[in-house]
């Protein structure tokens, strides 16, 4: 039996280095499916430690496809798994934030458990998702936004894909994705499905020297800054961690209903996003997009506060800049035409 797995079976905890080695073993295919399943099951049952998570993140980053780092980009990504079937809020927010001047490197994938993954809805919107690393960097430079399709950068994840699907419950990999940005983005909005996991992820990321990151979780269970209830926030800025609660009404936004932001398909999500960007939708869909886009502008240094960022996001939608940005993102380059 793998010695790291043996430690877990016997009730032990892994050091950062041991966790790093265990993840390398998983990513390299050195473990049997049974050993992978046992490791993931034990961790899920007893809960991962922050030290273990840091070791896992380092290993995942080391196994990712090489891409030039950029500390200026912002990612809006979440763990998913909240089971609430909302439209792709972080994707809509990314488009608005990029229209307002933030450099967005959106990391995402197809749907696993939700009605619509970020890759699914971007395709429905007519935006190319499988660009090369070079083309993605060019898109970020020229259009303020590029999409990093997770399977292109984390191909070693295929070693555990079958086991994860067979297990059918959340594992540590649900938490690792947002912490393993291919460009090692130092500025992020990370949505988490529970307050406890948000704390764990923040503690795990802190040793990796993030510049400005918000971990957000709605009291309604949404892995976003929500509009139907208060939101819990952990803010990491350099080496300072603060925790607070946000009430959307403090931003001048009326609390809405969850049903107003739920969808049944990527196509329905894309339609709602188009209506938001065209400023043809008011209420909860508009407000939750502006709130999360405002957060991206805040961590990206384009606004001095969450409040200022939210107001800037609303104005970006109302003045037509967000609509124009969507049209710009849909325009294919010569390289994208070749790979389409």
Positions of the model-derived regions?
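N-terminal glycine-rich anion-binding loops that anchor highly charged ligand groups
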Residues: 8-54, 61-69, 288
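Helix N-cap / loop-to-helix initiation motif
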Residues: 15, 32-33, 49, 90, ...
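N-terminal basic/disordered segments at the start of proteins
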Residues: 1-15, 76-84
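Short amphipathic alpha-helical face segments that pack within enzyme cores
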Residues: 38, 92-96, 288, 292-295
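A glycine-rich phosphate/pyrophosphate-binding beta-strand-loop-alpha-helix module
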Residues: 40, 87-143
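Active-site cofactor/substrate anionic-group-binding motifs, chiefly glycine-
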Residues: 47-112
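A general structural signal for well-ordered alpha-helical segments in protein cores
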Residues: 2, 19, 36, 53, ...
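Glycine-rich anion-binding loops and their surrounding alpha/beta cores
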Residues: 7, 62-65, 86, 101, ...
